[in-house]
UniProtKB/Swiss-Prot annotation:
Protein name: LYR motif-containing protein 9
PANTHER family on file: LYR MOTIF-CONTAINING PROTEIN 9 (PTHR47061:SF1)
Pfam annotation, one family: Complex1_LYR
Alphabetical list of InterPro entries matching this protein: Complex1_LYR_dom, Complex1_LYR_LYRM9, Complex_I_LYR
Domain of life: Eukaryota
Family note: Belongs to the complex I LYR family. LYRM9 subfamily.
CDD domains per UniProt: Complex1_LYR_LYRM9
Length: 78
């Protein structure tokens, strides 16, 4: 399961934030979109002070994997 198109272009936290918000629009219901949009925003705030480049890349990689998993989960259910 490759990540969504555009995932390879994510190199910094702001690009990740925008990518994840676009992924939320692909979820099937408005309530799911709202839930995951809120989750993305909260996670961005929590990690806003992160300054270690290696840790930032680790967070980006994990967030893309998690977004792919969530989208595949709801794609199979609907």
């Amino acid at each position: 399961m490759p990540p969504l198109p555009g995932a390879e272009l994510v190199h910094n936290p702001l690009q990740l934030y925008r990518y994840l918000l676009r992924c939320c629009k692909l979820l099937p219901t408005e309530s799911l979109q709202h839930y995951y949009r809120h989750s993305v925003k909260q996670s961005f705030r929590v990690h806003a002070d992160e300054d270690d480049p290696e840790r930032i890349q680790q967070i980006i990689k994990r967030a893309i994997e998690d977004a792919d998993w969530v989208l595949n989960k709801y794609k199979k259910e609907s």
